Amino acid sequence: MKLAFIIDPLEKLDPGHDSTVAIMEAAQKLGHEVFVTSVGDLAVINGQAWAKLAAVRLQPVILVDGHWQVSQPWSELSKSQWMALTECQAVFMRKDPPVTVQYLYATFILELLAPTKTMVINSPQGLREANEKMYTLQFAAVMPPTVVSLDKGLIRQFLEEHGAAVLKPLGGKAGEGILFLDPGDRNFNSLVEISTQHGKEPVMVQRFLPEAKEGDKRIILLDGDPIGAVNRIPSGAEFRGNMAVGGQVAPTTITSREIEICALLKPKLQADGLYFVGIDVIGGYLTEVNVTSPTGIREIDRLEGVRLGEKVICWLEKQF
């Protein structure tokens, strides 16, 4: 198969951490042609989706003493050329957040592809509809108490009722901009003003879960089914477990409660064409559903001795 990956600049990716590189490596190993492009290199020509694609050859990472060893150079790009995306059997939309106007237009271009001929992972419409914070609200039964608002009074009332909380920007990623807020914090007004861009944007406010100190679990779902998990433990006084802010990873198991959460999400994820998803769970509560470019494959592979990228490609092969 020919597989196209819409990514951030290749030189900015960390092959020892990046899930996209892991999936591309797996595709290459299993005999498929791998191409890369960017959201800025998509076009519509005579009603068809096209992309400026460059074939890529990867030097796979190697696990040595529990760490990924990366060869240099780890990738080799051919000269890019315009190609109709209908020539590809699948397109992986793996551009990191934030979701910009350019990103949204890219999803409209990708929607011109017939899913039965060229599968887009994840679905363009699904990506537009599934804001990673707001989408979670459809599963309120398994979430901690949550409010979304830009109103200081409502947010203060929430804190008085539920105690300490975390404030999350609706368009954030990798723990960026998440703040811890105590009911009696003298900086309350300032923190809310910062989070809401001075009353211009609503934020998500969730009850703080003390279990966060034991870890924020990332569970990878493929077509709605859990295929692996990793625990991300905050470092020092930090309350966020995200790897991007220094969280340490540890092996973990998927509990019966978490299997129930996955089963609850599965029908909706499948209906929305969200095939490759990473959910975050703290203390048995769903906190986020990550659909744009979920990470965690490299860490799970390293800790569990598996190859989740190959699972993704083997699943894809069965779709045709």
From Swiss-Prot:
Q: What Pfam families does the record point to?
A: GSH-S_ATP, GSH-S_N
Pathway recorded for this protein = Sulfur metabolism; glutathione biosynthesis; glutathione from L-cysteine and L-glutamate: step 2/2
User: Would the keyword Zinc be found if you checked this record's keyword annotation?
Assistant: no
Task: Cite the binding residues for ATP.
Answer: 159-215
Keywords linked to the UniProt accession:
ATP-binding, Glutathione biosynthesis, Ligase, Magnesium, Manganese, Metal-binding, Nucleotide-binding
Matches recorded under InterPro entries: ATP-grasp, ATP_grasp_subdomain_1, Glut_synth_pro, GSHS_ATP-bd, GSHS_N, PreATP-grasp_dom_sf
User: Which free-text remark accompanies the cofactor?
Assistant: Binds 1 Mg(2+) or Mn(2+) ion per subunit.
A GO CC annotation recorded here is: cytoplasm
Which amino acids does the record list as binding Mg(2+)? E288, N290
HAMAP family reported in the protein's UniProt record:
GSH_S (MF_00162)
- Which PANTHER family does the annotation name? GLUTATHIONE SYNTHETASE, RIBOSOMAL PROTEIN S6 MODIFICATION PROTEIN
Q: What is this protein called?
A: Glutathione synthetase
**Taxonomic path:** Bacteria, Bacillati, Cyanobacteriota, Cyanophyceae, Synechococcales
**Which gene name belongs to this protein?**
gshB
